[in-house]
Amino acid sequence: MSKSTAEIRQAFLDFFHSKGHQVVASSSLVPHNDPTLLFTNAGMNQFKDVFLGLDKRNYSRATTSQRCVRAGGKHNDLENVGYTARHHTFFEMLGNFSFGDYFKHDAIQFAWELLTSEKWFALPKERLWVTVYESDDEAYEIWEKEVGIPRERIIRIGDNKGAPYASDNFWQMGDTGPCGPCTEIFYDHGDHIWGGPPGSPEEDGDRYIEIWNIVFMQFNRQADGTMEPLPKPSVDTGMGLERIAAVLQHVNSNYDIDLFRTLIQAVAKVTGATDLSNKSLRVIADHIRSCAFLIADGVMPSNENRGYVLRRIIRRAVRHGNMLGAKETFFYKLVGPLIDVMGSAGEDLKRQQAQVEQVLKTEEEQFARTLERGLALLDEELAKLSGDTLDGETAFRLYDTYGFPVDLTADVCRERNIKVDEAGFEAAMEEQRRRAREASGFGADYNAMIRVDSASEFKGYDHLELNGKVTALFVDGKAVDAINAGQEAVVVLDQTPFYAESGGQVGDKGELKGANFSFAVEDTQKYGQAIGHIGKLATGSLKVGDAVQADVDEARRARIRLNHSATHLMHAALRQVLGTHVSQKGSLVNDKVLRFDFSHNEAMKPEEIRAVEDLVNAQIRRNLPIETNIMDLEAAKAKGAMALFGEKYDERVRVLSMGDFSTELCGGTHASRTGDIGLFRIISESGTAAGVRRIEAVTGEGAIATVHADSDRLSEVAHLLKGDSNNLADKVRSVLERTRQLEKELQQLKEQAAAQESANLSSKAIDVNGVKLLVSELSGVEPKMLRTMVDDLKNQLGSTIIVLATVAEGKVSLIAGVSKDVTDRVKAGELIGMVAQQVGGKGGGRPDMAQAGGTDAAALPAALASVKGWVSAKLQ
């Protein structure tokens, strides 16, 4: 009996655990602290700093089943999903890793044992082919002489991409840095399927399928292209779970494995589809996986960056549901079946099921309102098309007006063999993107440029002043030996009391000083294991090796500590008041305010905000001790410690507890007791995205300042109303009632004046071919009274045509009224359009009543004078 996908995943992890590997949980789909990646797209992403030597783990062997998304940027599989056997937006990458431990021999032997042993995957050995890099004789000999694969099934692959080391069998992280050859294992499905072995002209067929890539990181590529051997070579491997499941379950398409068969049946059930071979079912089954897990990892639909990619995938799925005939919202209903089919890998998703479903439902409902109209517009444009390419401006209009991502438009066009001018679309988008860009802040983006080999020891939990030594200096991202007064730089110390930005808490400010220099620190950031002090040398000079005194801005740090501790209290209070579905989606803690983004599907009610505020202040009055303990990550989770969104944790973690009220994993700086916070005030609650709310709050002196400001405003209002704060509400109600009464009386007076004006005007009507024509410019009449006056005049004059105008604040207001017995000859809409055109405006309406506006008041007399001639011509 073949293994299920869940059993295959577990067997892989169990095998490598038996070989001394630490089983490491999948990291978030949002890469930690890596701006070069849109989404996690490989198993090695979470170990990148380990391979670069910037991070260390307490294990040298690891194995994972890593959730990955490829739907944006360089790795974008979106347009092929559903149309091929193996493309997905979401997939799981099985991997084993060696950090300077074993190398080629063991990596190859492990792979062969897992794939061919009767105890494990038991694949027929004769079905397996391998490739090696052309010059990697070591790997070739291991496969041939130790494993015993015949030479005809070992293929050397050279530089097949037009440059040295540019090969399918040579992996590199970038233009410089760790790199090395790789060996790939292929499975031969048999000669009943078209295709040739790797390296042959028919290699793109489906007969020979790559199932495992084993990368040997053995070189450090220099800027000049030279390859220096690494002192401790490493191994990074990746095997797509869906691909190996297809092989082990004896099917040729990933969409035929048990996991997808179950999901496709669920899609058919919620959409009403009956043809299980329909490609739209595949699209939706794939897309629910990426969408659900992205939302669970904190990504929300939006029009920027990761949120926009998520929105594109959701909307593509909704459109395919529409094609299948879905009559109501359906996509969110697939989260439950997905959790069931993912087994143990779906536990994180299950905890957030309600939140994920709500976000998907809201997004689908919003898009459904414009989908039909957008598709109709696209149909119209395609019907008019003379060539085979839809212009970029139309694609942009569909995006801008109807929320159609360009790839959804391309999807529709693809079904009709029409291309989309994506370059034209990008040009139309550029102005919007430019407006959306944010200023980068202080100086350059040092974090993207600086690579520090040294490590810094943080001692800021216990010290705000400390002596240290300069271990590195950077100017404009380049290492230098010394800096002089006036230069901006990043200073790295061997030890420091300065906290580097992390976990939502901003970096410290302060001063680095010595007998002959002073360096003003404006920010503190992490660079791998080093801590960089970003700022400007105010006086003197500073060089690598100098001793410095590092002084943190104590008052600022104190305010940050209060705000950070209050954030923990508020998080716990929100979960008590709103429910345990609340989880952190982002935070900012600085010296002025705390900002907290959390999952919740509706605006908080005033009484809920008050309840959270009261609960936090109650904990402050309890003056609970704030304690930290270092423990294993699993022990911390067992204790109920909440993890911060987007943070990466080591196996040993810092657990912060506030009595029995709050327990979280946190590396930030905090107050000693909750009583130190003094006072907590929420100053705003708002929405930031579908299913995400934001609270801003203040503490301590900041909270007291808001109390004083509120009191001052109340005193000012009381003074204006000649009352006091005790009876202020009654005073305001009284003033509002009096205002309403006066407004009512004023309106009555205006109506009386308009009626009188109408009576006076009726005598000025002239006869034009048996119809009474009245044209007049009025002064001192509100534009909204014109309609009432026209109705009165029509009643008085009988068979009539009326044009009234008034000017207020330089703007012209026009109205035309035509009695119904005349509308067959004169239509109010045409008449008002003729007049409005002359005063720089436009308007329209019914045949018997029409209104317009204009901007050229000076042209009004001539425009009104033209009415008589126009009407006379119509009445002849």
UniProtKB/Swiss-Prot annotation:
- Self-association state and partner proteins as the record states: Homotetramer.
Which coarse location class applies to the principal site listed for this UniProt protein? cytoplasm
Domain comment text?
Consists of three domains; the N-terminal catalytic domain, the editing domain and the C-terminal C-Ala domain. The editing domain removes incorrectly charged amino acids, while the C-Ala domain, along with tRNA(Ala), serves as a bridge to cooperatively bring together the editing and aminoacylation centers thus stimulating deacylation of misacylated tRNAs.
**What Gene3D superfamilies does the entry give?**
2.40.30.130, 3.10.310.40, 3.30.54.20, 6.10.250.550, Bira Bifunctional Protein, Domain 2, Threonyl-trna Synthetase, Chain A, domain 2
Q: Which reaction does it catalyse?
A: tRNA(Ala) + L-alanine + ATP = L-alanyl-tRNA(Ala) + AMP + diphosphate
Q: Name one GO biological process term.
A: negative regulation of DNA-templated transcription
- Which cysteine pairs are joined by S-S bonds? none
Q: What does this protein do?
A: Catalyzes the attachment of alanine to tRNA(Ala) in a two-step reaction: alanine is first activated by ATP to form Ala-AMP and then transferred to the acceptor end of tRNA(Ala). Also edits incorrectly charged Ser-tRNA(Ala) and Gly-tRNA(Ala) via its editing domain.
Q: Which NCBIfam families match?
A: alaS
Cofactor(s) this protein cannot do without: Zn(2+)
One Gene Ontology CC term in the entry = cytosol
Q: What is this protein called?
A: Alanine--tRNA ligase
Q: Which UniProt keywords apply?
A: Acetylation, Aminoacyl-tRNA synthetase, ATP-binding, Cytoplasm, Ligase, Metal-binding, Nucleotide-binding, Protein biosynthesis, RNA-binding, tRNA-binding, Zinc
Q: Give the note describing cofactor binding and stoichiometry.
A: Binds 1 zinc ion per subunit.
The first-level EC class reads ligase
Pfam families recorded for this chain? DHHA1, tRNA-synt_2c, tRNA_SAD
* Bilayer-spanning residue ranges: none
UniProt modified residues of type N6-acetyllysine = K74
This protein's species is Escherichia coli (strain SMS-3-5 / SECEC)
Q: Which family does it belong to?
A: Belongs to the class-II aminoacyl-tRNA synthetase family.
Quote the subcellular location field of this record. Answer: Cytoplasm
CDD domains for the chain: AlaRS_core
Q: Which GO terms describe its molecular function?
A: alanine-tRNA ligase activity; aminoacyl-tRNA deacylase activity; ATP binding; tRNA binding; zinc ion binding
Enzyme Commission number(s) from the entry: 6.1.1.7
Q: Where does Zn(2+) bind?
A: H564, H568, C666, H670
| Keyword presence, Nucleotide-binding | yes
